[in-house]
Amino acid sequence: MTHPTELPLSPLSALQFYATAPYPCSYLDGRIARSQVATPSHLINSDIYTELVKAGFRRSGVFTYRPYCDGCRACVPVRVPVGAFTPSRTQRRMWKRHRALVATVSPLHYDEEHYALYMRYQSARHAGGGMDRDSRDQYEQFLLQSRINSRLVEFRDLDAPAGEPGKLRMVSMIDILGDGLSSVYTFFEPDDQHTSYGTYNILWQIEQAKSLGLPYVYLGYWIRESPKMAYKANFHPLEGLLDGRWKVLDPDRVELPPVDAALARAPLPGGHSGSG
């Protein structure tokens, strides 16, 4: 099976690409997913990863992949062109509400307080999804392993007793690419009411990209049918990778290839269904 997006020959010619076996889609119930994986991982440096991201790839730890599903093209890679971005009135309110948070940028590292917040977040937001049972090793493999230029950003309250850090509210992992920032993963305090940490985090990344002279913030995949991904459509303008080209995306009007239900919902090998 071939995809409409063709990989450039250089600097990716040293890599090999293979398709995974089918597995249950984690975004759309009842769908079957596959990924295309770039290997070997030790050859994927920041320059090569930049080219891979522009071709629709993402990473989880040192695992670099993009959707490669039979009969489904629901996952659309998206990015925000920071020079053209204009925050909405709601986003300006969110920025003002959380602007007192103090952001500290550091290399990837393990911190017990971060891990505890991650587990609270998973238990509250994604209970039963598997990640709410992640061990420390799984957490580190997922978020703290990287062979590229990655950073950990923690957001804390400004007010704290003298000599003590403010309360931890949010942690974000980002990759610094040749042409932008790539948002890897963000988790935050789930018990805080009337907050918009996720949106604030993207606004913060947009401001950081501007200050670094980088033109884009890559947000991963937007999926029209997935409520988890709906927030990405609130950033305007938004560009999507469609038919191998980045173009301005109108989430309400974009025409995506129809899903081949017979393929997208085919049973997994061994008689397992794609639901879950």
Swiss-Prot record:
Care to name a GO molecular-function term for this sequence? arginyl-tRNA--protein transferase activity
Q: Name one GO cellular component term.
A: cytoplasm
Instruction: Name the EC number(s).
Output: 2.3.2.29
**What catalytic reaction does the record list?**
N-terminal L-glutamyl-[protein] + L-leucyl-tRNA(Leu) = N-terminal L-leucyl-L-glutamyl-[protein] + tRNA(Leu) + H(+); N-terminal L-aspartyl-[protein] + L-leucyl-tRNA(Leu) = N-terminal L-leucyl-L-aspartyl-[protein] + tRNA(Leu) + H(+)
Q: What EC class is this? A: transferase
Q: Which UniProt keywords apply?
A: Acyltransferase, Cytoplasm, Transferase
Q: Where in the cell is it found?
A: Cytoplasm
A GO BP term here is: ubiquitin-dependent protein catabolic process via the N-end rule pathway
Q: Which Pfam families match?
A: ATE_C (PF04377), ATE_N (PF04376)
Q: Which InterPro entries match?
A: Acyl_CoA_acyltransferase, Asp_Glu_LeuTrfase, N-end_Aminoacyl_Trfase, N-end_Aminoacyl_Trfase_C, N-end_Aminoacyl_Trfase_N
Keyword Transferase found: yes
Matching SUPFAM superfamilies, A to Z? Answer: Acyl-CoA N-acyltransferases (Nat) (SSF55729)
Q: What does this protein do?
A: Functions in the N-end rule pathway of protein degradation where it conjugates Leu from its aminoacyl-tRNA to the N-termini of proteins containing an N-terminal aspartate or glutamate.
Which family is this sequence assigned to? Answer: Belongs to the R-transferase family. Bpt subfamily.
Q: Which PANTHER family does the UniProt entry name for this protein?
A: ARGININE-TRNA-PROTEIN TRANSFERASE 1, ARGINYL-TRNA--PROTEIN TRANSFERASE 1
Protein name (database record) = Aspartate/glutamate leucyltransferase
